[in-house]
Amino acid sequence: MGNGTEEDYNFVFKVVLIGESGVGKTNLLSRFTRNEFSHDSRTTIGVEFSTRTVMLGTAAVKAQIWDTAGLERYRAITSAYYRGAVGALLVFDLTKHQTYAVVERWLKELYDHAEATIVVMLVGNKSDLSQAREVPTEEARMFAENNGLLFLETSALDSTNVELAFETVLKEIFAKVSKQRQNSIRTNAITLGSAQAGQEPGPGEKRACC
Amino acid sequence: MALVRGAEPAAGPSRWLPTHVQVTVLRARGLRGKSSGAGSTSDAYTVIQVGREKYSTSVVEKTHGCPEWREECSFELPPGALDGLLRAQEADAGPAPWAASSAAACELVLTTMHRSLIGVDKFLGQATVALDEVFGAGRAQHTQWYKLHSKPGKKEKERGEIEVTIQFTRNNLSASMFDLSMKDKPRSPFSKIRDKMKGKKKYDLESASAILPSSAIEDPDLGSLGKMGKAKGFFLRNKLRKSSLTQSNTSLGSDSTLSSASGSLAYQGPGAELLTRSPSRSSWLSTEGGRDSAQSPKLFTHKRTYSDEANQMRVAPPRALLDLQGHLDAASRSSLCVNGSHIYNEEPQGPVRHRSSISGSLPSSGSLQAVSSRFSEEGPRSTDDTWPRGSRSNSSSEAVLGQEELSAQAKVLAPGASHPGEEEGARLPEGKPVQVATPIVASSEAVAEKEGARKEERKPRMGLFHHHHQGLSRSELGRRSSLGEKGGPILGASPHHSSSGEEKAKSSWFGLREAKDPTQKPSPHPVKPLSAAPVEGSPDRKQSRSSLSIALSSGLEKLKTVTSGSIQPVTQAPQAGQMVDTKRLKDSAVLDQSAKYYHLTHDELISLLLQRERELSQRDEHVQELESYIDRLLVRIMETSPTLLQIPPGPPK
């Protein structure tokens, strides 16, 4: 799974990061896309995304990962944020049970705004702080299974499972797309600009309308 | 208990005597609705009274019969109550036949009222708690619901109940933290002075006279004496209502009185006479002031005691001023400036003299100088006016501070440093350059120079206040404000007070006002010494005003430092000339930050807090608006050109 060049990709998958404030969404993103980690604990303001292209088999998949503040309040950006997303990482902080307790609320919001076919992974972040763990792995795993979610525990700090988490999600998305598209492996790009507005539901179904 | 008793063998085991009782009004329920209009809500507050001391909670607005205050106050137990408690205790051990007779002396009376925007506040209910009975039940904290009754003699109806926590305490523990701190530092140094002063004090008379002059002074500066009456009257009303204001006023008054007493007893008499003689304004003021002074002591014992200390400290400066006039007291000089202005004003000396003395010795006198000039012009009135002037200038400066705390400090500092030459020049012409040596004075002088500018500024300000004071001329408004702020000039801390006091006075009708007026908001807060001082050297009037107030505060600070070096280590560092003064000012400003709150009464602190909360909530709203705006922008970006949101690939770290 090497990094492809920015221009050279077959698919663009929009993946959103969601979860409570302070669970480490932004650091997961920076770890995955830039291999950076910041101890600066400032909360994210606004919305931004970062991309990284990975090779899934023969296909170059550009992951476009969106990040925003994990605020409870309703935001005008909510629907735009989820629109067109084919994957989501629902992150909680395994050292703070409260962030896990509200996962269901996040799931609801996700399904309210995103496609039903979206690939969702439950991510227990901060696994490096095992001594402060408040959420048992099995409990989270059970919850994920019961809700049809993927599950991993990660650490953006020491990089544990960060790549794996994203790639797993991308693979899942890719598998779904491939299944739907069957043999058509031509450039199906979910491009942000043009595709976004007229995007059809379903992961990977969006073609760049060039 | 055992420990306590052991510590006081003399009293014996059953003789633990509380000196204070701390009353926390938690909440009420089942209150009757009084507001006309929607539902049966009321704007409820509770007056807590023990003996002659009274406190009032804040007003919980639009409560549906169940306001929650959670506000506490502490009462010094009156001597009579003490006996009652003692007997009650003894009663525990054995029958005390005389216990019942003294019970009336220590009743806690809780009167819940509805604040009416118009007209008299409405009675919601009253509960009377016999403190000796409570104490008889043990020293532990008592929290209990008390049924609210109708006024005695009136038909009893369901009025709900009020939950109160009563805790008996001993010593000053119940008093504010400041009290304790004060004891350690400023008190000791000033205590001597205090004592001396006290010997000379004639509280009632003096305070009254003192108050009057301050109010009067303001007017002269503006030049519209006739207006003063109105303004004063306005303030007085406010004062009457708000105890805190009265306090500050009284403190000022006492200071002035003290100074006057010590320095020029003879003058006081005449001054008072003049005040009374002078048209309604002065008389008003005098009478009002007298009331305030009389009331204030009763209302807030603890704080009052505390404030007294402050006053004493303040007093000390005036005294020093006096001394300076006669002889130069190095230590007292700085202090002199602050109070000095008042003192001088009070003094019966000819107007010309006042000028010189003021300019020379008093920092606050900067304004005074101008005043003094007018003084001479005015002639007989001048005596009365002089006071008001001094106060006015102070008050105005204070008001300015409120608006521009930071800038004010900076300005203050700046004037001291930047205008030394000017100041000196001013002094010389006045003919009393000798005493001027203190930097504070210089700053004040600079301020005085800027007075003309100030006046202009004042007008705009007044405009701000116009809403409150309809029909009053700007100058009047300014005077009013100054009146409200009388307390300010004396102490470094006091200026803040006074400013807050002003706000309250303005807003006294309803506590709400303070929050609404942008200008007023800042005033309650103490000056922010550090940041502002160096940055802003602009010669704005506001600055000058602030500088005055700062100078005053700094003067107080200096006094403290002089008397007790321990208080402000920073100031101790010896520096030459005005530089030292400016630094001191800065230091004092820092100290002022906490000092401003020293004199605040419980009510004042609460109102300040409420104001802050209001401001915060307003800010929150603003933040939310901004957030939603940003969100909307983001949505547009996401829908049109989302690539703008891509995190730019920065250089690898």
Curated annotation (Swiss-Prot), chain B:
Residues 375-387, 420-430, 447-460 have a biased composition (Basic and acidic residues). Residues 277-286 have a biased composition (Polar residues). GO terms for cellular component: centriolar satellite; ciliary basal body; cilium; early endosome; early endosome membrane; Golgi apparatus; Golgi membrane; intracellular membrane-bounded organelle. Phosphorylated on serine and threonine residues. Phosphorylation at Ser-357 is PKA-dependent. Pfam families: C2 (PF00168), RBD-FIP (PF09457). It comes from Homo sapiens (Human). GO terms for molecular function: gamma-tubulin binding; small GTPase binding. This is Rab11 family-interacting protein 5. It is a peripheral membrane protein. Residues 5-146 form the C2 domain. Residues 269-300, 342-402, 415-548 are annotated as: Disordered. It is found in: Cytoplasm; Recycling endosome membrane; Early endosome membrane; Golgi apparatus membrane. Residues 357-368 have a biased composition (Low complexity). SMART domains: C2. Detected at low levels in heart, brain, placenta, lung, liver, adipocytes, kidney, spleen, skeletal muscle and pancreas. Rab effector involved in protein trafficking from apical recycling endosomes to the apical plasma membrane. Involved in insulin granule exocytosis. May regulate V-ATPase intracellular transport in response to extracellular acidosis. Antibodies against RIP11 are found in sera from patients with autoimmune diseases such as systemic lupus erythematosus (SLE) or Sjoegren syndrome (SS). It is also found in the sera from mothers of children with neonatal lupus erythematosus (NLE).
